[in-house]
């Protein structure tokens, strides 16, 4: 079974995107990372930084998660990210996404040993 850490990498990590600037980026990535398998995942964020830099966030600023848990961490610096958001015309199995690039601080939930990101909580 896929570990929570591996799932985070599959769903959220894209360190050196070949086509993040393309408006089609989300449509391609959401499909290739299996985020449209049994439904269209409505919202998803890809982080264009090294895995080491994202894992390091687990040792940065401790903040509360959206669900009230206390194991979330906010990155000290802004990171290159791409937000993918399902459009109104999207209907499974033809999932359609809007691609938005940004530079924001990320908030991730971490757990385990080694202590690594297992959930993408927000960007600010």
Curated annotation (Swiss-Prot):
Pfam families: RnaseA. It is found in: Secreted. Keywords: Disulfide bond, Endonuclease, Hydrolase, Lyase, Nuclease, Secreted. It is an enzyme of class 4 (lyase). Its EC number is 4.6.1.18. InterPro entries: RNaseA, RNaseA-like_dom_sf, RNaseA_AS, RNaseA_domain. Substrate binds at residues 7, 10, 41-45, 66, 85. Residues 1-13 have a biased composition (Basic and acidic residues). Residues 1-25 are annotated as: Disordered. It catalyses: an [RNA] containing cytidine + H2O = an [RNA]-3'-cytidine-3'-phosphate + a 5'-hydroxy-ribonucleotide-3'-[RNA]; an [RNA] containing uridine + H2O = an [RNA]-3'-uridine-3'-phosphate + a 5'-hydroxy-ribonucleotide-3'-[RNA]. One of its GO terms (biological process) is defense response to Gram-positive bacterium. One of its GO terms (molecular function) is ribonuclease A activity. GO terms for cellular component: extracellular region. Pancreas. The active site is at residues 12, 119. Disulfide bonds join 26-84, 40-95, 58-110, 65-72. Endonuclease that catalyzes the cleavage of RNA on the 3' side of pyrimidine nucleotides. Acts on single-stranded and double-stranded RNA. Belongs to the pancreatic ribonuclease family. Monomer. Interacts with and forms tight 1:1 complexes with RNH1. Dimerization of two such complexes may occur. Interaction with RNH1 inhibits this protein. This is Ribonuclease pancreatic. It comes from Rangifer tarandus.
């Amino acid at each position: 079974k896929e570990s929570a850490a591996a799932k985070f990498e599959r769903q959220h990590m894209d360190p050196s995107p070949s086509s993040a600037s393309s408006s089609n980026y989300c449509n391609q990535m959401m499909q290739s990372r299996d985020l449209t398998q049994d439904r269209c995942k409505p919202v998803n964020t890809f982080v264009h930084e090294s895995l080491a830099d994202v894992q390091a966030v687990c040792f940065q600023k401790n903040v509360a998660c959206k669900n009230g848990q206390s194991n979330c961490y906010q990155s000290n610096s802004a990171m290159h990210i791409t937000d993918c958001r399902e459009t109104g015309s999207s209907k499974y199995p033809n999932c359609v996404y809007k691609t938005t690039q940004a530079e924001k601080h990320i908030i991730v939930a971490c757990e385990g040993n080694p202590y690594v990101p297992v959930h993408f909580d927000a960007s600010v």
